[in-house]
Structure formats: structure tokens, C-alpha cells
Amino acid sequence: FEGLLENNPNIKNLDSVVGFLRASGYFTLRPFLNSINKVRMLIGIDVDKYIVKANNQGHLFFGAEEEVKQDYLTQLRKDIENSVYSSHVEEGIWQMVDDLVSGKLELRAHPSKKIHAKIYLLYPDNFNEWSTDGCAITGSSNLSGNGLGISQDKQYEFNVMLRDNEDVQFAKDEFELLWA
């Protein structure tokens, strides 16, 4: 993702469909998302406890009063201060919560399908039939430490990048159907 995002400044959106989302994956990917305006993640069959907690709490105050937001953030701060997380995890949690609160990150679990696909769509805000800088990456990598190759116990992953506009549009249309 680093090279792709650094060399394609017009890319402003990341949509992903993954079977597994691990905090380690989001925390690793996050430094490269500063130029991205919107991240939408559709999660399939497994979400770890950090993601579940952040997402559930985030949904509690979307559209709610400012007082509820502040109460939750105070509660989260106490939880983190009293935990044994590393500073990397703590920073990642704060960034993830901030991304959820700001609307930069949206997480959904599909209500009826057990999703196993791994698809990453990167495209500009004005993506259309004439766009040349969008891409779809599909393969075996979930958004996890293993999937991104950062874990000690690395596993073989195989992914393919599709750049033809028709392929990207097809993947984007499929994502929108699942997201709806």
C-alpha cells in the first residue's frame, strides 16, 4: 500500500472487503492512509476484540449528543490507561477511534453473507469511466499482521492488482451491492 499510495496522489478512497480484520492490520496500514479521505471496510467472518469494541462504541454515539461522545472518550481513555497495551497498540486504538468518530473510517459486518473474499479498491474522488488511476487488488491477504506480512510467523500470500477501468468498476459495483 505504501508505494501505491505514495505514487498515486489522486487516490482518495479505500474500500475493502475482507474475511478478517485484525487491529494489527489496521494499525500497520494507518500511517499510509493520511492522504485518503474515506476508508470503508466490510468485514466477513472474524473480527478481533479490539475492532469489535471500537466499532461497537463508535456506533453508540454516531449522531448522538456531544456529551455522550465525551463520556465515551473519557471511558476509553481510562480503559487504555489501565491496560497493558504497548504504546504502538495504544496509539493505534486512539487513531482508529478518531477515524471512526471523524467518519474517515466506516466498518460494517455483512448481515447475511459469510464473506471470505479479499478485495481492496483504491480510487480518486471523481472515479468515472475515464479514470486511469484506480485499482482493485484481490487475492489471499486479509487486513491482518499475517496478511500484510508483518507477523513473525509469515505465511504465503498471493495478490493481483487490476488496473483496467472496467475491472475496477466491476469490483466497485460489487462492493456497493455488499455495502448497501
PLM feature segments, named:
Residues 1-180:
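PLD/PLD-like phosphodiesterase catalytic module centered on the HKD motif
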